[in-house]
Amino acid sequence: MHAFEYLRAGGLKQAGDWLRQHPESRPLSGGMTLVPSLKHRLAQVSHLVDLSRLGELRGIERQGSSLRIGAGMRHEEVASDPQVQSTLPALAHLAGLIGDPQVRARGTLGGSVANNDPAADYPAALLALDAVVITDQREIVAADFFLGMFSTALQPDELIVAVRFQVPRRAA
């Protein structure tokens, strides 16, 4: 692993400022993909900006006809949340099958969406449910967000804050 500086963000604005100040930096939340990439020297960063304690990235909230899920919500939290289970049962089921218990306990919705691994389940779910990715700078419909394998419309200094799903009239 190459040397890097670790920065724990105290807020979303500070995290964005640090990403702009250090162009070779990367945000870190669950770290399920980034940390192994760093360990195996497949990626190199100047700074890691830790987002794991940011309250702005947490929470699951019904907002009218949509459900907003914070980017920092762990897979196991999405899977076990009563609101997700009742409004988007397939998404709850999907989240409960991601990886293994350790991955579900650490990995986050935002990290999986930002990484856009073709083997991941969340990107397909966002596309199928016409979700909107909410960043600290704008809102992007899923169809415009995912550009290709491991590629998204995110700018280097842009952070996913939440994902908004329209609640379907019917769900199975």
Predicted regions and their residues:
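C-terminal structural segment of proteins
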Residues: 1-172
